[in-house]
């Protein structure tokens, strides 16, 4: 079963912008954490879609972030392991690290195909699907 799409994307701000629009940025709530390893301050916590949209430029300056997407008015779950993610209300989870590596997990296979296609069309490097057989990640943090 498909779990994610991983890739290297230059120009993080542009990548974030496109990912957020492809996944309906304003139609969801977002939770940003795992930002403590950065040289630039970014507020950890819950964001409306509009708040996150306005913070994309600052977000792109980070080296590490975990961004989770939730349906509106949903409680934020504790997600440590992949199993927690699967059992949570979170429908997508983006791990961004080292300033250009992205792992986009989604429970919606169509979303994964859309992001993969977009990545290929826009020259993302090392783009690949992550599935049950090749996903080595169990811990959904850095």
Please tell me what each predicted stretch does.
Residues 22-25, 62, 122:
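Surface-exposed polar/charged interaction patches
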Residues 96-142:
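Acidic, proline/glycine-rich low-complexity IDRs
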Residues 1-55:
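N-terminal interaction modules that seed assembly of large macromolecular complexes
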Residues 11-17, 40, 75-76, 103, ...:
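Short, surface-exposed beta-strand/loop "edge" segments at domain boundaries and coil↔beta transitions
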Residues 28, 90-92, 99-102:
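Short, surface-exposed beta-edge/turn micro-motifs
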Residues 33-94:
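Surface-exposed, low-hydrophobicity interaction/linker segments
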Residues 10, 35, 70-73, 99, ...:
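Generic structural motif
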């Amino acid at each position: 079963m498909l779990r994610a799409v991983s890739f290297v994307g230059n120009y993080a701000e542009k990548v974030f912008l496109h990912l957020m629009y492809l996944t309906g940025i304003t139609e969801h709530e977002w939770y940003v954490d795992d930002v403590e390893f950065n040289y630039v301050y970014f507020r950890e916590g819950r964001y409306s879609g509009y708040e996150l949209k306005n913070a994309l430029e600052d977000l792109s300056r980070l080296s590490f972030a975990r961004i989770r997407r939730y349906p509106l008015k949903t409680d934020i779950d504790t997600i440590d392991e992949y199993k927690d993610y699967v059992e949570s209300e979170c429908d997508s989870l983006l791990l961004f690290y080292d300033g250009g590596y992205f792992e986009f997990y989604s429970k919606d296979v169509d979303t994964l195909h859309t992001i993969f296609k977009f990545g290929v069309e826009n020259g993302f490097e090392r783009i690949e699907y992550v599935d049950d057989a090749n996903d080595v990640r169990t811990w959904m943090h850095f």
